[in-house]
Structures are given as C-alpha cells and as structure tokens.
Amino acid sequence: MMRKTTILTLTLSLLSSVQLWAKDYRVSDFGAVADGTTLNTRALQRAIDVIHEEGGGRLIFPLGRYVSGTLHLRSGVTLHIESGAVLLGSNNPYDYDREPGLNTAFLLARGQKNIGVTGEGLIDCRGRQTAYNLVDLIHRGLVDDRLGLDRPNESIRPMIFYFRECDGVTVEGISLKNSASWVQTYDQCKNLKIDRINVESNAYWNNDGLDIVDCENVTVTNSYFDASDDAICLKSHSGAHMCRNILIRDNVAR
C-alpha cells in the first residue's frame, strides 16, 4: 500500500509540474509587430527558444499579420494562432534557411518532441511570389539551380512545414495556404495527429496538400485539402523505414 501511495504521489507531482511548465506566452512580449510588413523572424525565434528553455508552453499569436522567414520549432513548444491572426511567409527567398538534409520551409523541426501548431488562424506563405523571386535569383546567377521543367527544384522552394524525425506532433484547427512547394511534410515522424485543418494551396507547382513520409502512428481526420497536386500522399524515401499504422478518415480532398 505504501508503494502504491508513493507512486501515485510521484505521478501527481509530475503532472502538476507539467501543468506549471505549459505556460502561455504572447508574441508581443518578444517584440513581434503585427503590421504585415515588419520581418519578425528574429523576435519569433527568440520566443520559441525561450519557451523551450523554460520547459515548454504555447506561443500565442493574437489578431494581426506577422511576417517571418524560417522558424525552427523546439521541443515542448506549440504555436497557437488565434482567429484573425495570420502568419505571412516572407517573399524574400534569402529569409528561408537551407540546411543539409532538410528541405526549405517556413516552419522547420528535426528531432524534436511534443511540438504543435494549433488555433483557428492562418499561415499564408505567399508562395507564388516567393517562387517567382527565386526564379529571378537563379537567372541572375545568385542561386544555383538548373531550373528543370522551367521551375526551381521543390527542395529549395519553401514548404510551410517540414518536420523530420519528430515524436509527438499535433496540428489542429489551423488553415494553411499558398505554399511554394509541398504544403506540409512529415518525414520519419512518430505519433502525429492532424485534425480539423484547412489546406488551400494552388499557388505553384508541386503543391501537395499533405505528405506523410516513413511515419508511424498517424491520424489525419476531419480536414479539407484543396491542392494543385496530390491532396494526401504517403511516401517512403528510405529503405530502412516505412509508413506504419496510418489512419486517414472523414476528410475532403479535391
């Protein structure tokens, strides 16, 4: 009896600690400006890093328009985009990170745990203009790409999400719009939940709505996909991995 009581007490203590860590932070507290023109990458990345270092929580985006380049999502951090809030992707291709082994994206994560994007707001990456600007840089010799099929390789055009080798991912309620490439890619991720999202992406070539690559334990439910390429696509890029335990139910795709 004493052992059971000790275990229960320890469990409740741990749950209490998790609740204390899971605080809400507002982007304005880190200097983000919601005017639709100011580049907020540095302020937003600092906010994500601080929340991660403090043990996790939600970064709240209230009503407004927030421009940013690539953001790196960290373990324990959820971006919560409220109704009326819009995250706008920068139209400058140089504002997006290019790292070995990772595709270019507005929101990047690799090897992170318990991350998410939630709320009733919108992420609009304005991909058509960003892709056109990238083509211009290639023609001027400032970016190296052979322009196969008269368009930049999809790996250097920014997706909205690229999450790789992450465990415990929640994407819920939000709208995603106008990627310059695939909209969202989850590569070798585990325990992924996608629910009640709205995807409208007809901005450019290769506008897949959702790509699930070598993932395990995935649910995709109650969502809408309007994409100019594959709406929902399961893939494998590695001989050592495969898609396993995937549930896709009650969605609309066109």
Segments and roles (model prediction):
Residues 21-254:
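Extracellular/periplasmic carbohydrate-active domains that bind, remodel
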Residues 9-17:
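Bacterial N-terminal signal peptides
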